[in-house]
From Swiss-Prot:
Keywords: Lyase. It is an enzyme of class 4 (lyase). Its EC number is 4.2.1.104. It comes from Prochlorococcus marinus (strain NATL1A). This is Cyanate hydratase. SUPFAM superfamilies: Cyanase C-terminal domain (SSF55234), lambda repressor-like DNA-binding domains (SSF47413). It comes from the Bacteria. Belongs to the cyanase family. The keyword Lyase applies. It holds the Pfam family Cyanate_lyase. Catalyzes the reaction of cyanate with bicarbonate to produce ammonia and carbon dioxide.
Amino acid sequence: MSFPESTQLLLKAKKEKGLTFADIGILLGLDEVWVASLFYGQSTASDEEADKLLTTLGLGTEHKEILTTPPVKGSLDPVIPTDPLIYRFYEIMQVYGMPMKDVIQEKFGDGIMSAIDFTINVDKVEDPKGDRVKVSMCGKFLPYKKW
């Protein structure tokens, strides 16, 4: 998978500064997953957020526009992912997507979970049998309307 030049530049600067997405999130007052989505061109920063980020990473203001312009979301390659970690999420949806859809619709009715009015958090859960990854998604329910 190839990434835009802006993504590569941001990731390189982050690595050179020895920062994590969590470190940058604290600086900006935003969640680490949202910050990562900004790096990958899937979110839009405010002018203030872009200025803080660019200053922290030691990058010039010529990169501000790419951070503050609304992106084409979901614009990653439309093929089945090959990265093992990302593929697991694809696999999870293949196995549990329809069951999740049915359970959500039993509880809420006919509609969807928003990915706009939405948060996602990633946590580490220590376990003697092997640490666990806990992914929590919280999206507003949007019922389909009748007309």
